[in-house]
């Protein structure tokens, strides 16, 4: 996080020299940075703000000496995957294991502080959320008689299943044919259900999961058991997302929104693994701010 602030926090556009090869090919120019390709190991430090290379797959001839020389001269050398993460908020799944996408060990301070904030914020919000939940339950029951709560087995931290609670937003027979993704115009969703899904009100009962320690306010969204089995087989590194406690909201939710198929889930995973790799109180605060914007706009809901 702080590296990205130092590199891209200034007003001037950063100019980076790119050594060809490996994941450096995935870099694209933005309003914050431009790249100059170098097919030969000659770089003038005054012309660029740093050097970018795939340190695991770099041309041998001359380039290692070039990086060492410029590093000693004070010119920063960045791994191409780091620059990609800074600019996109995602990790490159193809190199996730090599670059430790499972993240660094969480410090006791972060774990305890986050857990304390989870409990404190849930309890502090009850005077507002309890009346809202009662009204929501009444609206669901009036429109579609039946259980107002929906409990579904999801996969949590360490791959352990737990019963996640939501307000029921679909017909009572919505999953008679098994688990399936929700479409944008899904006929199974009730009118009240569409409203509470748009503004994420259906997630409020998960405060109970948070108090029990099964979930956090912030983390990768817990997925259904059948989908986890499918994605573990189809998507490389998918299991890494279970190395932290799942959340009611998360980096993937505010940056990518709902995923309705395997391709979208793969893209969403790249955001989840970014959070796993970089989770911190600062990133959590940013996610809270973006979640408020998401709720107000209804971004990514289905």
Language model segments and positions:
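Short, glycine-rich, amphipathic interfacial segments at transmembrane boundaries or analogous
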Residues: 84, 90-91, 150-188, 249-268
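A short, structured surface patch at a secondary-structure boundary
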Residues: 183-245, 287-291, 295
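Acidic active-site catalytic centers that drive phospho-/nucleotidyl reactions
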Residues: 118, 202-203, 272, 284
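A hydrophobic, helix-centered structural microdomain
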Residues: 110-175, 209, 281, 286-302
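N-terminal hydrophobic signal-anchor/signal peptide
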Residues: 2-130
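Membrane-cytosol interface motif
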Residues: 14-34, 147-170, 190, 195
């Amino acid at each position: 996080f702080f590296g990205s602030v130092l590199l891209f926090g200034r007003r001037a556009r950063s100019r980076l020299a790119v050594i060809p090869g490996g994941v450096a090919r995935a870099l694209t120019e933005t309003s914050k940075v431009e790249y100059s390709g170098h097919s030969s190991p000659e770089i003038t430090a005054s012309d660029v703000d740093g050097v970018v290379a795939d340190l695991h797959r770099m041309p041998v001839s001359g380039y290692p000496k070039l990086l060492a020389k410029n590093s000693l001269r004070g010119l920063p050398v960045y791994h191409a995957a780091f620059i990609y993460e800074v600019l996109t908020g995602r990790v490159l799944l193809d190199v996730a294991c090599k670059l430790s996408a499972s993240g660094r060990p969480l410090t006791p301070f972060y774990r305890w502080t986050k857990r304390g904030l989870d409990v404190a914020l849930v309890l502090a919000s009850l005077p507002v959320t309890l009346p809202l939940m009662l009204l929501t339950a009444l609206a669901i029951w009036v429109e579609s008689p039946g259980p107002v709560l929906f409990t579904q087995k999801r996969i949590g931290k360490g791959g352990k299943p737990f019963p996640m609670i939501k307000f029921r937003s679909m017909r009572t027979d919505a999953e008679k044919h098994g688990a399936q993704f929700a479409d944008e115009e899904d006929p199974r969703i009730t009118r009240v259900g569409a409203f509470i899904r748009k503004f994420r009100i259906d997630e409020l009962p998960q405060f109970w999961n948070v108090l029990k320690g099964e979930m956090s306010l912030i983390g990768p969204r817990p997925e259904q058991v059948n989908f986890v089995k499918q994605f573990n087989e189809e998507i490389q590194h998918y299991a890494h997302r279970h190395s932290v406690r799942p959340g009611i909201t998360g980096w993937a939710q505010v940056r990518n929104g709902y995923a309705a198929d395997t391709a979208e889930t793969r893209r969403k995973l790249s955001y989840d693994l970014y959070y796993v790799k970089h989770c911190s109180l600062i990133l959590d605060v940013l996610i809270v701010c973006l979640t408020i914007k998401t709720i107000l706009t209804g971004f990514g809901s289905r």
